[in-house]
């Protein structure tokens, strides 16, 4: 059945993520977000896509979208990227005007970092 077919193959997903990273490296977050939004809709549990999209949205000034994406990505992030994702989440909250929320996330990140060392 056609509805059961994936929207993106693994190779297409990987190619779009690499292209998005290249756009981010070239300071073109809007272009990265354009590539990542449909990918995120198709693969909402793909942490790498969500993290990359959060960075693209934050860099594009879409702080509310970035905060929402980063909040979800932070909870699912593997330990080796959790601190970085927490900082992105806190920055998005700060820029959206939620300073108490940003402080709370920063304190949580610092506490987790301290217990892991």
Give, region by region, the residue ranges found by the protein language model:
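Start-of-helix register in tetratricopeptide repeats
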Residues: 14, 48, 81-84
């Amino acid at each position: 059945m056609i509805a059961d077919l994936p929207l993106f193959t693994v190779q297409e997903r990987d190619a779009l993520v690499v292209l998005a990273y290249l756009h981010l490296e070239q300071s073109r977050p809007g272009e990265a977000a354009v590539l990542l939004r449909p990918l995120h809709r198709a693969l909402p549990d793909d942490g790498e896509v969500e993290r990359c999209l959060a960075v693209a949205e934050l860099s594009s000034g879409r702080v509310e979208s970035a905060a929402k994406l980063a909040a979800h990505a932070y909870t699912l992030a593997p330990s080796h990227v959790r601190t970085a994702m927490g900082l992105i989440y806190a920055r998005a909250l700060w820029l959206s005007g939620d300073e108490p929320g940003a402080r709370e996330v920063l304190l949580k990140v610092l506490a987790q970092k301290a217990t892991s060392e």
